[in-house]
Amino acid sequence: MKLIDIHAVAIIPAKTDSTRLKKKNLRVVAGKTLVEHAIDYAKASKLVQDIIVTSESDEVRDIVETYDNVLFYERDKSYMGEREVADVYVNIFQKQFRDKGEWRIPQMATHVVGIQPDHPDRTNKLDDMIEYFIKNKYDDLVTVDSYGTRNGSVRIVKAEMVKHGTMSRRVG
């Protein structure tokens, strides 16, 4: 696959009902909320064509509405709590796109890039990671910390795996 053929969709899950730290994705770090850091990270990519923020929060919706070309999808309550984030991605592709009549995105998507807002200190450029993913012909890639422990800051998956619900649920 050539880079010109890439249509990456960034999905930023930004729930505010975290059990350990309430509204953590709305916390301000270096003058911006964690949600804003995640959106800006996605917007800096030349390979990401669509950005979707999903949340149950009107506060998150208000932040998203200040950005051009960023979609807000209200997260279904059954996808809250300690649900695997992979289930959120699959739900967006299998249900929410259909319900919103957004057929263009899932039809065009080649890759899904999950960006967790609670990691604002990313040092790798998103495009470099996507290019690495493609060059090495991976199906699924998740970031790790300096000790090699998965941190889920960014996860890249072939869109077909998300569309069909075949992506691993226990990564990232």
Predicted segments, located by residue:
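N-terminal nucleotide-binding beta1-loop-alpha1 segment
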Residues: 1-22
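Short phosphate-binding loop-to-helix
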Residues: 52, 58-113, 121-122, 128
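Short glycine-enriched, charge-decorated loop/helix-capping segments at active-site entrances
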Residues: 24-29, 78-79
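Local beta-strand N-terminus motif with an aromatic residue
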Residues: 6-8, 48, 108-109, 138
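Hydrophobic targeting segments
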Residues: 7-12, 35, 50-53
